[in-house]
Amino acid sequence: MNTKQSRIRRARKTRAKIAAVKAIRLAIHRTNSHIYAQIISADGGTVMASASSNDKDLRGQLANGGTTAAAAAVGKRLAEKAKGLGIEKVAFDRAGFKFHGRVKALAEAAREGGLAF
């Protein structure tokens, strides 16, 4: 089993636990050059809000989309969008990635923006 398969296996376990409690989830995806975040409804069928380092408004502000500063900006932007929709509590789905670096920066910025998880 390689590292990608291990990450996907961890992600499946997390998603199953979140689905069992029927919580709105904040799902992230990380690539070498960008970071993406979505708030997904409890039934898993609707993306309620999204933000990424590849968005037009953030792309102009960021020198590089693959940094912790970019991840923090994405977390802050997503928290603002969630507050606008009246979403305050979510379950954090880190998609099997370690809670370190860019993933941690996004999570902390979202918490500072008012999301609880």
UniProtKB/Swiss-Prot annotation:
Gene transcribed to yield this protein: rplR
Family annotation (NCBIfam families): L18_bact
Annotated protein name in UniProt: Large ribosomal subunit protein uL18
Gene Ontology BP, a term: translation
Domain of life from the UniProt record: Bacteria
Taxonomic lineage from the root: Bacteria, Pseudomonadati, Pseudomonadota, Betaproteobacteria, Nitrosomonadales
Pfam families cross-referenced by the UniProt entry: Ribosomal_L18p (PF00861)
Assembly: Part of the 50S ribosomal subunit; part of the 5S rRNA/L5/L18/L25 subcomplex. Contacts the 5S and 23S rRNAs.
Family note: Belongs to the universal ribosomal protein uL18 family.
Matches recorded under SUPFAM superfamilies: Translational machinery components
InterPro entries assigned to the protein according to its UniProt record, in alphabetical order: Ribosomal_uL18_bac-type, Ribosomal_uL18_bac/euk
Protein keywords: Ribonucleoprotein, Ribosomal protein, RNA-binding, rRNA-binding
Main function: This is one of the proteins that bind and probably mediate the attachment of the 5S RNA into the large ribosomal subunit, where it forms part of the central protuberance.
